[in-house]
């Protein structure tokens, strides 16, 4: 499947991806071009054993991998996200990433930015995934 051209010459993706990207519990929703909750798949990372597994027919929890450095942590999270996206998308997709929350303070804001920066860089390197950032106030 490829992206269809609109009358204005822009392309419409067949797979829409919503990403709420955090350090502790990032989540991804994979949807077709016509949203139907029952046809979506929802994926999240967790450190809590009770939240690992399948819930209903379309919600999946995955365990965080262990890490030794912050960069290893960020790489693990972005690898998980890209694996989920590539497994569940069609040929081309459009991802929407929730932007940064300005409520974050101190060292956390830098880790959040570095984490998301790695994901955005890796998405940019994937020719079949376009992405946009959506500010939290409109989500």
Predicted regions and their residues:
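Phosphate- and other anionic-substrate recognition elements at nucleic-acid/protein interfaces
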Residues: 2-139
């Amino acid at each position: 499947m490829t992206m269809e051209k609109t009358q204005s010459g822009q392309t419409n993706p067949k797979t829409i991806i919503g990403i709420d990207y955090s350090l502790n519990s990032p989540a991804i929703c994979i949807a077709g071009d016509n949203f139907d909750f029952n046809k979506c798949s929802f994926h999240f990372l967790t450190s809590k054993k009770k939240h690992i597994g399948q819930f209903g027919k379309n919600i999946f929890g995955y365990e965080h991998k262990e890490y030794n450095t912050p960069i290893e942590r960020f790489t693990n999270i972005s690898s998980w996200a890209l694996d989920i996206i590539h497994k569940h998308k069609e040929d081309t997709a459009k991802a929407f990433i929730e932007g940064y929350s300005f409520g974050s303070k101190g060292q956390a804001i830098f880790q959040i930015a570095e984490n998301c920066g790695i994901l955005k860089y890796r998405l940019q390197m994937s020719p079949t995934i376009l992405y946009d950032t959506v500010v939290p106030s409109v989500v």
